[in-house]
Amino acid sequence: MSGKELRYGFTTGACAAAAVKAAAQMLRDQGMVHEVELMLPCGIGASFQVHGGVLRDNTASCYVVKDAGDDPDVTNGAEIHVTASIEFFTKNRIVIEGGTGIGRVTKPGLAVPVGEWAINPVPRSMILEVVKEVFALRCIPATLTFNISIPNGEELAKKTLNERLGIVGGLSILGTTGIVKPISAKAWTDTVDASVDVALACGARTVVLATGRSSEIVAQKHLALSEEAFVMMGDHFGYAMRSCASKEVPEVVVAGQFAKLVKIACGHEQTHVTSSQMDLDALAWWLREVPATAHLEQMAREANTARHLLEASGYNQAVIELVCSRVLKVCAEVAPWVKMRVMLAGYHGELLYFTP
């Protein structure tokens, strides 16, 4: 077994923000920039090499090459280009737009509204922050426009799920932490085991298995438990449940957002998008069987994503309780001796439901 530590990489969002910062500095200082420093959302500082700088009167262009580390990411090596332009004596505003190789959202249910460029909220926020940082002392009113492009983005997007999700014409600018963690199932499951061991060793009677960081944050806000009690299981639901059962954890809380809980409810023990598709047809059948939700069957069949269904139904309480009850049923099948609860985290940091 190799002892090599897997190398982290950077998200397209982090690379785009770095390229924007470099182009903004070039525009402000009227000089070339070869490297920029960036504080990532996860709190880690990072340095990015800047390439292809071109400077004209009111425009500046450059690009950053995405390094995905040891993660098998199709966008590894992609060039994230940015062209910055400034128009003086206009309304003070910052415009972020997509160009060649950046997709547009055509279906509901995603974090970005239909019709918008597929630049997700966290990368967009990062970009706004670096622009405000660079032009903090700007006195003359001006419109700053940043055009983000990926030359081969449309071709690369064919290797992703973008088209199925309704993102057409290219890639998405993604990321919530700024870093890409290498996918290593063995490393991840080893971490789950170790985390559960630590929780028990620290006296935890309840272990919270979170599908992601956003869900974990919601759980931490609402549960008065020690830090060690929170375990990031990621997509490894089945493994994490069996780990808790084998270690005789008294109580387990499964915390996740709606789309992940739908996957678990459908019986998928591994919930990564490449290994289990969200089975909205199954959900439609469940809705049909319950009088309070039968009228939503067709909506489920026509939904683009599970999140789309949740939002389109107006966060229907009966739908939420149905999915959470199905998750409890699956948990009982996987680990029948463990006391279980399910927490549904919203997409905006709120708690939507917590089973009794």
Curated annotation (Swiss-Prot):
Signal peptide limits: none
Pfam families in alphabetical order: CbiD
Catalytic activity: Co-precorrin-5B + S-adenosyl-L-methionine = Co-precorrin-6A + S-adenosyl-L-homocysteine
Pathway(s) annotated for this protein in UniProt: Cofactor biosynthesis; adenosylcobalamin biosynthesis; cob(II)yrinate a,c-diamide from sirohydrochlorin (anaerobic route): step 6/10
Source organism, top-level taxon: Bacteria
Name of the protein in its database record: Cobalt-precorrin-5B C(1)-methyltransferase
Biological process according to GO: anaerobic cobalamin biosynthetic process; methylation
Gene Ontology MF annotations: cobalt-precorrin-5B C1-methyltransferase activity
SUPFAM superfamilies with a match to the protein in the record: CbiD-like
Gene that specifies this protein: cbiD
InterPro entries (UniProt xref): CbiD, CbiD_sf
EC number of this enzyme: 2.1.1.195
